[in-house]
Amino acid sequence: MANIRVFTFNMRTDAACDGRNAFSAERSAYIEKEFPKYEADVIGFQETRPEMRQWVIDHFPAYTVCGIGREADLQGESNIIAYRTDRFDLVSLDTFWLSDTPQRPGSRFATDQSSCPRICTVVTLRCKENGRLFRHYNTHLDHVGAFAQAQGISLILNRMVSDYQTWQMPVILTGDFNVTPESKVYATVNGFDGCGDALVDVSADVGFTFHAYQPEKTQEKIDYIFTNIPADPTKSMKATDNEDGIYLSDHYPVGAIVSLD
């Protein structure tokens, strides 16, 4: 049995308005210093701009980084997936847009969506320890439109069903969903059984994840790890590190340990 430590990590785009917490100010160095102690095997990132993607490649050489930007020119923010090269082989990689034309770069839903295109990055990985395959879907749902959120997650789940009919392998879904556990989107995903065993929110016990650099005031649970791979939710975790007001992000990275046999 291979235990795999999976994380979802909204890295927060580089924004000067964050002051010392801007990625290009003090935060990137803090991530490099603190995040490795969590020994993540697979990480689904959100809000990684091209320079941040390159930073991950340069500063975390033990990982292979996959994914493209969400804009029409394949630049802009991405939902990259990083996996430990010594533990996994890449079998397949894809990106699709959350829109009525998911293969058209930069596309988005025509109504009730922000100006931001939204994407889902998908990798199939083979575990070197036991040869088992699994698929990892990583996304960032819209932060404005409830319709776009609902349509986006429906598109992802339909894709998972289609993929399962071809691949018949277990799945992991990570991301910043921009909705709370009381939402219809959450209810749609948690317990979804269209791709084999039902999806379970193995991050359910970690508490709030979005804090906007002020956790004493802002507390929202919007970051999730769903999977149908066996896992113990009580062993899930979130990275609450901060040092003199510097955080890993305005979201807490969230992790879970799944057991692939």
List each language-model region with its residue ranges.
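N-terminal, active-site-proximal structural segment of metallo-dependent hydrolase catalytic domains
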Residues: 1-59, 70-77, 260-261
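Metal-dependent phosphoester-hydrolase catalytic domains
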Residues: 147, 151, 161-171, 178-261
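Generic structural signal for small/hydrophobic residues in well-ordered secondary structure
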Residues: 6, 10, 31, 82, ...
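Active-site-proximal beta-strand elements of phosphoester/diester hydrolases
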Residues: 3-18, 91-96, 122, 132-142
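Structured beta-strand-rich core segments of catalytic domains in phosphoester-bond hydrolases
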Residues: 42-133
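Short, Asp-centered acidic motifs that coordinate Mg2+ and/or phosphate
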Residues: 4, 41-42, 134, 170-172, ...
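Acidic/histidine-rich helix-loop elements
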Residues: 8-27, 98-115, 145
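Catalytic metal-binding/acid-base residues of hydrolase active sites
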Residues: 12, 49, 140-142, 177-180, ...
